[in-house]
Design a protein with these regions (language model features):
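Non-Sec secretion/translocation targeting segments of pathogen effectors
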Residues: 1-58
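Basic/polar, acidic-poor N-terminal "presequence/leader" segments
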Residues: 49-93
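Active-site nucleophile-adjacent alpha helix/oxyanion-hole segment immediately C-terminal to the catalytic cysteine
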Residues: 69, 83, 89-95, 99-101, ...
Length: 326
């Protein structure tokens, strides 16, 4: 399914898989929930929210109040063309640019400034990432799940990365075929990216900034009661989905999200060889991250395939995984 009309995405098409990351660091004893016979249910579905607990409602701001904000604004504009400057000006006038409804209360402006002035991950371009982030916030309907082709000059590198540690000749041959993705299974991930850009632009900009930085990851603090009705059930879910996290109490947890290890190569290719209607480097990183969350850290951006304990298919996410991701 496409994301061009993502608010009406048809999820009747089955989505699909999983793997693991590092063990989690938790102050909460999870032994009581290891052997639950029934998978715990999620808290009732609510609109995406980035707020840490007890964050007050935010006023809309349309004026640059401080010298720091004015400097950030001027710096961002200096890296954009005429059309880009017009879009940013409109984001300011509509209150989007100074929106601070993000997990760390940073504004869209703050994160765009970091993208423009701080180093990006290897092979990523700050101006491209800045332009793509602004465009997605201004008009989320441009977000797509359309994979790009692998240019000849990248083919050998991509196949080698996908066949890393494989010794069986059949597996190696199959691995060389799997990198030519024709039909994407990232519908849920693209839909989640869309909703984040549309509903929480400051959090979207924060994700874009952190995921494209050299650390290639983003932290997010959540209230455990937003994940499940019972704290131990929330911990069970985080462990079941292999989400790296830390807890200091029974109320909140700091989660770490990251794209899969091959996403950076896909993003590098899209930075230099993006064709019209294909995903941007930002789309690659965002969608890989959300696929990792839903597939228990088993997604591979080179093949658009996954493994996982909750589904035996190797594409997309099933409903349970979709609900957890969102």
């Amino acid at each position: 399914c496409g994301v061009i009309m993502v608010e009406q995405v048809n999820f009747r098409t089955r989505q699909y898989n999983y793997n693991t990351i590092n063990s989690v660091k938790s102050a909460v004893n999870t032994s009581d929930v290891k052997n639950l016979s029934v998978t715990p249910t999620f808290t009732a579905s609510v609109p995406i929210t980035s707020k840490a607990p007890q964050v007050a409602s935010l006023k809309m701001r349309t004026t640059l109040d401080s010298k720091e904000e004015k400097n950030e604004y001027t710096t961002i504009l200096s890296q954009l063309d005429k059309n880009g400057r017009k879009i940013v000006d409109n984001l300011l006038k509509t209150g989007v640019l100074l929106n601070s409804d993000s997990n760390d209360h940073s504004t869209v402006l703050d994160n765009l400034y970091k993208i423009a002035t701080e180093p990006r991950a290897e092979g990523l371009d700050s101006k491209t990432m800045l332009k793509d982030t602004i465009a997605a916030i201004a008009y989320p309907y441009i977000i797509t799940q359309q994979f790009g082709d692998i240019p000849p000059e990248y083919q050998q590198q991509v196949v080698a990365a996908n066949n890393e540690n494989k010794t069986n000749l059949i597996d190696i041959w199959q691995g060389s075929q799997d990198v030519n993705v024709e039909h994407s299974g990232t519908c849920v991930a693209a839909s989640t990216e869309f909703k984040l850009a549309k509903q929480l632009p400051a959090e979207f900009a924060r994700f874009a900034q952190e995921l494209s930085s050299p650390k290639l990851s983003v932290n997010k603090t959540i209230g455990l009661n937003n994940l499940a009705d019972e704290t131990l059930n929330a911990i069970w879910l985080l462990n079941a989905f292999e989400i790296p996290f830390e807890t200091n109490n029974f109320n909140t947890a700091k989660l770490k999200f990251a794209p899969d290890k091959n996403a950076i190569l896909r993003a590098q290719i899209q930075t230099t060889n993006k064709d019209p209607y294909e995903r941007t480097p930002l789309d690659v990183l965002m969608q890989s991250t959300f696929m990792q969350i839903g597939s228990q850290q088993s997604y591979n951006s080179l093949t658009d395939k996954r493994a996982g304990k909750f589904n035996q298919n190797d594409k997309g996410l099933i409903e349970f995984e979709k609900t957890f991701t969102e």
